[in-house]
Amino acid sequence: MEYSNLRRQIIFMKKNLFDQGYLDEQFNQLEELQDESSPNFVEEVAALFFKDSSRLLTNIEQAIDKYPQDFYRLDSLVQQLKGSGSSIGALRMKNECSVFKVNCNDRNLEGCRRSLQKMKREHATLKQKLESYFQLLRQVGPRDYAVSSRK
């Protein structure tokens, strides 16, 4: 695919990630940190996020299934997940973590379960969308290491 078409596709894809609420300004800030000396910085940070957040989601699921539920532990785990999501600009993940925390504070186990399922879906969707985005970035190569198109 021609370079300019790829670039347009990347800009369009990124704009959609923002318009659909998957990402927030923190993602742009991460991209601004990326430079020629670390052309895959954002992709590497995202990979670390997905590894860590997968572990946290598993831990949350195990804590929900453990009886009696330890809502303080659940709150702590979700706070970690929310912080991780915030660090890469995962807006929908961060927002669903906030909903989970409200359910947790209310001791609403069923609400926590629903929020967990939504967090898992948002996590999987964001991972798929960012993998596609990074794949396009790899196709244009290091000459365009930061596509800093504002949304």
Swiss-Prot record:
Keywords from the named record: Cytokinin signaling pathway, Two-component regulatory system
A single GO cellular-component term on record: nucleus
Every HPt domain range: 38-133
Entry superkingdom: Eukaryota
GO biological process: cytokinin-activated signaling pathway; phosphorelay signal transduction system
Disruption outcome: Dwarf, narrow leaf, low fertility and small grain phenotypes.
GO molecular function, one term: histidine phosphotransfer kinase activity
Matching Pfam families: Hpt (PF01627)
InterPro entries attached to this UniProt entry: AHP1-5/YPD1, HPT_dom_sf, Sig_transdc_His_kin_Hpt_dom
Role according to the record: Functions as a two-component phosphorelay mediator between cytokinin sensor histidine kinases and response regulators (B-type ARRs). Plays an important role in propagating cytokinin signal transduction.
Protein name: Pseudo histidine-containing phosphotransfer protein 2
